[in-house]
């Protein structure tokens, strides 16, 4: 994945109470992605992968794919993915309005090198993608298709199909609808369910 945010400053638009918490408690709080303004995007990403895999499959493989996705989404839908949103844009009117208490909040500048140290072994910093073409060319697509067509999972790399789907679910949090593209978003993403395994 692209790290075009590396070495740059990242900006977090928020209210004064969040600023107090960040400074006073020396903490960054992540939100459950399903509680954010783009909660449907995770399911949309999974459906995009499903649709792409189904193209060109036999009827039996098509049914197997849909059954597998239904089972996996049922397993994962309550697994939390937490994120904190940043932007590459320092002074963006839309984000002031949307995230900084209608322009009466703050825009905090963060150093990416320090954020990477904070996130090490606990969370990832990922650029957000706004196009489904990226999702349609994702590695998950080929891994799941290989499982559907050949019953194969690279056990050394992944262990089993559940691990591939868990990773796919986590990645779904960095895909958003193209209407948000102007935000130039980068996210810290944490997966507590993945840390347990």
Show which residues each predicted segment covers.
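Partner-binding and oligomerization surfaces adjacent to conserved cores of proteins
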Residues: 1-197
């Amino acid at each position: 994945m692209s790290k075009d945010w590396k070495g740059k400053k990242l900006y977090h638009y928020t209210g004064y109470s969040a600023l107090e918490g960040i400074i006073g408690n020396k903490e960054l709080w992540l939100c459950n992605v399903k509680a954010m303004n783009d909660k449907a995007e995770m399911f949309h990403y999974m459906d995009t992968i499903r649709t792409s895999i189904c193209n060109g499959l036999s009827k039996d493989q098509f049914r197997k794919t849909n059954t597998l996705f239904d089972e996996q989404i049922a397993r994962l839908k309550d697994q939390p993915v937490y994120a904190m949103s940043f932007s590459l844009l320092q002074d963006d009117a839309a984000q002031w309005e949307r995230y900084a208490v209608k322009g009466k909040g703050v825009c905090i500048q963060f150093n990416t090198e320090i954020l990477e140290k904070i996130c090490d072994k606990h969370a990832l910093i990922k650029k957000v993608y706004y196009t489904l073409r990226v999702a349609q060319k994702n590695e998950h697509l080929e891994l799941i298709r290989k499982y559907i067509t050949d019953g194969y999972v690279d056990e050394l790399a992944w262990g089993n199909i559940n691990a591939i789907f868990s990773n796919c679910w986590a990645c779904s949090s960095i895909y958003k609808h193209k209407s948000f593209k102007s935000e130039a978003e980068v996210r810290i993403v944490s997966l507590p369910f993945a840390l347990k395994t």
